[in-house]
A protein has these predicted regions:
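Cleavable N-terminal signal peptides
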Residues: 6-8, 17
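Alpha-helix termination/capping residues and helix-transition junctions
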Residues: 10-11, 95
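Alpha-helical transmembrane segments and their juxtamembrane interfaces
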Residues: 12-13, 187
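Sec/Tat signal peptide C-region and signal peptidase I cleavage site
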Residues: 13-19
Length: 191
């Protein structure tokens, strides 16, 4: 009886594992950006050029998706070299001590068809806090070049600098507390 139970458990675990698909973002067709307000009168946009995101899901509508994101903070780019160098310094991202920023999803809930609230833990500047973002699943299509399935996603949300003790010296008049996150990603099957 014990052997049958162990075999049944192994079979169920294998079935569940094979039912899940892992997807990885295509760096050439993915973007992770942000907007922050400078002096409360002008928006500054930037991107991270080096990031990796995986999704694990078993449902075709991704309603059970789990996201894992790792961002290389040294890859920040605002199209102004002087500002980018300052943003990498201890005044802001402190990339020498915090070379990565991460997000691990903890839950996903449907808002409407293909629109979800994605919750998870964001680690920025050594501080981990729960955040919730809006996620849109934009569909899956067979890529005419690779002949493999690609899935598209769009994500938006707002985080607060103060929640992560990020650049407190900037105060609330130099930089807005709210940072808008905008991401678009094209993901291909990894398995």
């Amino acid at each position: 009886m014990k052997k049958i139970t162990i075999l049944a458990a192994a079979f169920l675990m294998t079935t569940v594992a094979f039912g899940q698909t892992t997807w990885k973002n295509d760096p050439m067709h993915s973007k992770l950006g942000f907007t922050i307000t400078h002096l409360m009168v002008s928006d500054v946009d930037g991107i991270f050029k080096d990031f990796h995101c995986t999704i694990v899901a078993s449902k075709p509508d991704f309603s059970d998706a789990k996201f894992q994101l790792t961002v290389n903070t040294t890859s920040i780019n605002t199209d102004v070299d002087y500002r980018d160098k300052d943003l990498r310094s201890a005044n802001y991202f402190d990339v020498a001590n915090f070379p990565t920023m991460t997000f691990t999803s903890t839950g996903i809930s449907a808002v409407s068809t293909n629109h979800y609230k994605l919750s998870g833990n964001l680690t920025l500047h050594g501080v981990t806090k729960p955040v919730t973002m809006d996620l849109w699943y934009r569909g899956t299509i067979t890529n005419p070049m690779s002949k493999k399935d690609d899935a598209g996603f769009k994500l938006t949300g707002i985080i607060k600098r103060s929640d992560f003790n990020f650049a407190p010296q900037a105060g609330s008049t130099m930089l807005s507390d709210e940072i808008t996150i905008n991401a678009n990603g094209e993901f291909g099957k990894a398995n």
